[in-house]
Design a protein with these regions (language model features):
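Conserved catalytic breakage-reunion loop centered on the nucleophilic residue
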Residues: 4-217
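Glycine-rich, charge-decorated loop segments at or immediately adjacent to ligand/cofactor-binding or catalytic sites
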Residues: 1
């Protein structure tokens, strides 16, 4: 049916326009909706003649963010150490106790970093697409990280082809501390991957004839 074909083409055209508009706005540093990350609130601003919102640092929450990163930057500090600390202090994040998946997500988020040339070089070395010039990374602003058009969902933790854009808001965490945390996260992921690689598909299925215990790796 020709009507169905035209309807499908129209849907695809609209979808492409929406996608193009999204990437165009994201490349210019617009906040792309959603709740403000912990440590910030939003205020309305106008960028390039378009009404949008800007993240503004919340001083009390920013202090918790800095402490979180300072703690994790220590070689022996774990997720559990940090979540327990904030739970014992009665500090909530968006009204909830801090849990490990949320903590990991926050530690990876470049929205908090005071992005300088070291941050630029790090993301460049990881294969990210950097929208701004190196000279723009002055150690003042945070960043937005957007999933590139060709990035597969399974590779979302990989920075290759993801798009990094300087944001108009001020960063919270010094670049050296943020980078220490990010590299620690990357090393932990490598260790976990190596452990998974040592396990065979026969684990738990074959048992020792003498002791009866199952094969674990």
């Amino acid at each position: 049916n020709i009507c169905i074909v035209f309807a499908q083409l129209e849907r695809e055209t609209i979808q492409k326009r929406v996608t193009d508009a999204y990437y165009s706005r994201s490349q210019r540093g617009f906040k792309m909706g959603g709740k403000a990350p912990y440590g910030f609130h939003t205020e309305p601003i106008k960028m390039d003649g378009i009404n949008t919102k800007k993240l503004v640092v919340n001083p009390d929450e920013a202090a918790n963010i800095r402490l979180m990163f300072e703690m994790y930057a220590q070689p022996t500090t774990s997720y559990g150490d940090i979540t327990r600390h904030f739970a014992e202090q009665g500090i909530l994040f968006h009204g909830k106790e801090l849990i490990r998946p949320t903590l990991a997500q926050m530690l990876r988020n470049p929205v908090y970093v005071q992005a300088d040339l070291d941050v630029y070089e790090f993301f460049k070395s990881q294969g990210a697409v950097l929208v701004n010039d190196a000279a723009d990374f002055t150690g003042m602003n945070g960043c937005y990280l957007y999933q590139g058009r060709d990035v597969k969902p399974s590779k979302k933790n990989d920075l290759k082809d993801q798009m990094l854009v300087l944001a108009p808001h001020e960063g919270i965490v010094p670049s050296d501390i943020w980078l220490t945390c990010r590299k620690k996260l990357m090393n932990n992921m490598k260790i976990q991957s190596a452990r998974k690689a040592t396990h065979t598909w026969l684990a738990g299925k074959i048992k020792c004839g003498n002791c009866g215990y199952a094969l674990m790796s």
